[in-house]
Amino acid sequence: MARMVQCIKLNKEAEGLDFPPLPGELGKKIWQSVSKEAWAGWLKHQTMLINENRLNMADARARQYLLKQTEKYFFGEGADQAQGYVPPQS
């Protein structure tokens, strides 16, 4: 049976992640309160941030930036948007 969590991002009960996606306290916090669906949304957003900002993941500053954005995306006021990005109309 799948592990269910009350997803902090989607505000509903949904299937939880199989394991903490990051090391440390942030990974544990995400594992406890973020669903697979919300994590998949973050991965898409993270990819957009990496591409649009031309982040070099070998650079420690870029990795720190993404960790801060991860925390803001789930537990803060929301992550940065890529400059010039316009969300599709639904």
Swiss-Prot record:
Q: Keywords in UniProt for this one?
A: Iron
Gene3D superfamilies annotated for this entry? Fe(II) trafficking protein YggX (1.10.3880.10)
Record's Pfam families?
A: Iron_traffic (PF04362)
Q: Which parts of the chain are coiled coil?
A: none
Name the source's superkingdom: Bacteria
GO BP annotation list: cellular response to oxidative stress
Q: Which GO terms describe its molecular function?
A: iron ion binding
Q: What GO CC terms are in its UniProt record?
A: cytosol
| Primary role | Could be a mediator in iron transactions between iron acquisition and iron-requiring processes, such as synthesis and/or repair of Fe-S clusters in biosynthetic enzymes.
Task: Tell me which family the UniProt entry assigns to this protein.
Answer: Belongs to the Fe(2+)-trafficking protein family.
PANTHER family listed in its UniProt record: FE(2+)-TRAFFICKING PROTEIN-RELATED
Protein's name in the database:
Probable Fe(2+)-trafficking protein
